[in-house]
């Protein structure tokens, strides 16, 4: 679907969608651990729906009312579909191994390109057998033998999270090396704690205690990586209140508050469960480390396109292995609005050039589409946005939320 967006900005209120980093973990762990859970504030993004379908394939009964209730009755599935969800693929791989399943995992084309090697290597040492096929991977853990593990987390913290879930359901300890995005490990620890699993953690070493709890009721906190789009828009356009954001969140992308407040004349106001963003002037260059916050790179790059300060994206090469090659796509988006790009081995710098307005923008990556829309609204350009349906992967309510800020969609 292709759309244009019209209207004039007005101050408004946004409810941040659910953090799928939390919701996917809760859904999958409930299904594989046989522990029921009731979840409030689930936005039903494509990635969350994939996790729910995996839970169903494992025998879980799913009920939808004002909240989402998962009543598991675990059985090893013959097959599951991970779609384009890297999180579901990696977490389910460890969980299937823990339950000694023989299962085929379907993957969409883009997911087949994303790394899984380090996780496969660690599980293979436990006699888990993997066979790569054209449209997915076959895992056979029927003869697996649990033991202590070492995992290299240098390419993805999800490998570490997957093995943490594996050991929480089996036995043995875990040593994780070269952990990137350590706050995602904290999300996994909180998930396990909420299911009654105690986690001892010290310098990448993890041990697990098992006191399983029943009948959990959990409210999923709002997602900072989704809120980032509105934060950037508000910095250029005016006041936006964003609700359902915990001030003490362990989400790594909550770092956006300190990143912005460190360079902004007007600070983001922070309350217990909401923030307020104001139009501001920037006082210095912005630095974003992709090893810590890869999902913030697309929206924060917009600041370099339209402001007097530069955006420095550190460790940018890691962007190559996201849902798309976001390194190339950020450069494409920035240049389409006239920005200047400089690169060295470890840093990409985006600076404002002579502002230009593209006639159309075409990305398949959900975060790039939403970032482009925010850039277009800041520029006030008449732009055709393509593949708009792909934003459902993470933020199905994005277009509706635009209406809270004075905009409307022309299809």
UniProtKB/Swiss-Prot annotation:
Coiled coil: none
Catalytic activities: 3-phosphoshikimate + phosphoenolpyruvate = 5-O-(1-carboxyvinyl)-3-phosphoshikimate + phosphate
UniProt binding sites for phosphoenolpyruvate: 20, 86, 114, 158, 326, 367, 393
GO CC, one annotated term: cytoplasm
GO BP terms, alphabetized: amino acid biosynthetic process; aromatic amino acid family biosynthetic process; chorismate biosynthetic process
CDD domains, sorted: EPSP_synthase (cd01556)
Localisation per UniProt entry: Cytoplasm
One protein family per Pfam: EPSP_synthase
Keywords annotated in UniProt: Amino-acid biosynthesis, Aromatic amino acid biosynthesis, Cytoplasm, Transferase
Enzyme Commission number(s): 2.5.1.19
Quaternary structure, from the entry: Monomer.
Family designation: Belongs to the EPSP synthase family.
Official protein name in the record: 3-phosphoshikimate 1-carboxyvinyltransferase
Organism of derivation: Picrophilus torridus (strain ATCC 700027 / DSM 9790 / JCM 10055 / NBRC 100828 / KAW 2/3)
Classification of source organism: Archaea, Methanobacteriati, Thermoplasmatota, Thermoplasmata, Thermoplasmatales
Gene: aroA
């Amino acid at each position: 679907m292709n759309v244009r967006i019209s209207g004039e900005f007005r101050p408004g209120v946004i409810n941040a969608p659910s953090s799928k980093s939390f919701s996917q973990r809760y859904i999958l762990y409930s299904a594989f651990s046989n522990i029921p859970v009731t979840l409030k504030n689930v936005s039903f993004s494509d990635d969350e729906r994939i996790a729910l379908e995996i839970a169903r394939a494992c025998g879980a009964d799913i009920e939808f009312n004002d909240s989402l209730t998962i009543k598991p009755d675990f059985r090893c599935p013959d097959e599951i579909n991970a779609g384009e969800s890297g999180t579901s693929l990696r977490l389910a791989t460890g969980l299937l191994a823990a339950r000694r399943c023989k299962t085929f995992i379907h993957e969409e084309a883009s997911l087949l390109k994303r790394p899984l090697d380090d996780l496969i290597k660690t599980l293979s040492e436990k006699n888990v057998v993997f066979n790569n096929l054209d449209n997915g991977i076959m895992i056979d853990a029927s003869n697996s033998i649990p033991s202590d593990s070492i995992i290299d987390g240098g390419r993805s913290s999800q490998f570490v999270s997957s093995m943490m879930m594996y050991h929480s359901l089996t036995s043995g300890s875990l040593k994780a090396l070269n952990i990137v995005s350590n706050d995602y490990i904290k999300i996994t620890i909180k998930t396990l704690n909420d299911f009654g699993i105690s986690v001892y953690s010290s310098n990448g070493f993890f041990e697990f205690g098992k006191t399983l709890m029943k009948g959990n009721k959990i409210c999923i906190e709002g997602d900072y990586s989704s809120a980032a789009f509105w934060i950037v828009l508000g910095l250029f356009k005016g006041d936006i209140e964003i609700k359902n954001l915990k001030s003490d969140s362990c989400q790594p992308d909550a770092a956006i508050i300190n990143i912005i407040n460190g360079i902004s004349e007007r600070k983001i106001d922070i309350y217990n469960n909401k923030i307020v963003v104001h139009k501001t002037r920037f006082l210095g260059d912005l630095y974003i480390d992709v090893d810590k916050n890869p999902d913030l790179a697309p929206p924060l790059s917009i600041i370099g396109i339209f402001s007097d300060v530069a955006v420095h994206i550190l460790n940018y090469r890691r962007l190559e292995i996201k849902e798309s090659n976001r390194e190339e796509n950020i450069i494409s988006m920035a240049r389409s609005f006239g920005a200047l790009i400089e690169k060295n081995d470890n840093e990409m710098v985006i600076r404002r050039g002579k502002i230009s307005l593209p006639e159309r923008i075409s990305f398949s990556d959900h975060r790039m589409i939403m970032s482009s829309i925010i850039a277009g609204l800041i520029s006030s350009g008449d732009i055709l946005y393509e593949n708009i349906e792909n934003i459902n992967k993470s933020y199905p309510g994005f277009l509706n939320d635009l209406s809270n800020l004075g905009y409307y969609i022309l299809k």
